[in-house]
Amino acid sequence: MTLSTAQEIIEDIHQGKMVILMDDEDRENEGDLIIASDKVTPEAINFMATYGRGLICLTLNKERCLQLELPMMVKSNTDKFATPFTISIEAASGVTTGISVNDRARTVQAAIAATATAKDIVMPGHIFPLMAQDGGVLARAGHTEAGCDVARLAGLEPSSVIVEILNDDGTMARRPQLEVFAKKHGLKLGTVADLIEYRNKYETMIERISECKLNTEFGEFDMITYRDKINHQIHYALQKGNIEPNSQTLVRVHLQDTFKDILQTGSTRWTLPAAMERISSENGVLVIVTKQEDPEMVISKIQNLALENKETPVVNSQSRQVGLGSQILSDLGIRKMRLLSSSSHLYHSLSGFGLEIVEYVCS
């Protein structure tokens, strides 16, 4: 089955049709039914419940979540994919038990109304909102962001209702089953990676603001400085040597971390100095993605150090930084990467940025 382009997916969303979007095989590799919230009907909810079978969720941007005063479901998200659930909701009026398809459609309508406030919903309920990251799929390659993006690009409220597609036996539907499902129900099937490529072509979260030579203890680098258009954060790329599009470029994307960078905590092989030294000797690119560290997270790290706490760390803080790093690498003309990494961690939907990891350099 030929996959539909992002433009074809967006056109169907604009027309009020349901579509299927798949994510990476190295991520959840699931397919979600998606329909713009503006176009939701009881019949659409019934189709999702009957044939999708997964959890019916409502994707919302951060601005809408603040408008509705929605608290996150948990303070520290330790889910593998950092799925950003808020507390579940129900319409404050016009519903009965809240679970019927009519009630759930009504709840969606109440939540996305232009004048909606916290008084228009109650918590908990039978609709599960998901808060998309600023920047959409360019920041996080998830169905949450994809749902908001396709609706916005279709000229609608940036919100969608989504549900995972399960097989008849309750297992997750993968691409072969999704193709059969799409043909059976006459739905277009696309990918999050293609949506990323589409947005990366016509939109970007970053802009170059300066270029200069930078002398360091590891030699001279070309430093290219970028600005994040959303939060105005500044990021840097240190380049050594020329970049050839068809060559395999040595790359390190370094995410700012106070404890690792200044206090040298943690066991990572590729500290900032180590990465600079390696790239200086072999040529390549070091991208330094900065971030505003949440004071509560810093305090939590300090408390964990004091208690010698060995619990699994929170995993939701890097997805936006990875998206920014990918855009910078793409802007520099990099296609194939030899990635300096402490592990062969899989980064999702890089193909949407025109990037491919050909080797993990762990030592």
Swiss-Prot record:
Mg(2+) 2 binds at E28, H143. D-ribulose 5-phosphate binds at R27, E28, D32, R140, A141, G142, H143, T144, E164. InterPro entries: DHBP_synth_RibB-like_a/b_dom (IPR017945), DHBP_synthase_RibB (IPR000422), GTP_cyclohydro_II (IPR032677), RibA-like_sf (IPR036144). GO terms for biological process: riboflavin biosynthetic process. It comes from the Bacteria. Residues 202-363 are annotated as: GTP cyclohydrolase II-like. Pathway: Cofactor biosynthesis; riboflavin biosynthesis; 2-hydroxy-3-oxobutyl phosphate from D-ribulose 5-phosphate: step 1/1. This is 3,4-dihydroxy-2-butanone 4-phosphate synthase. It comes from Photobacterium phosphoreum.
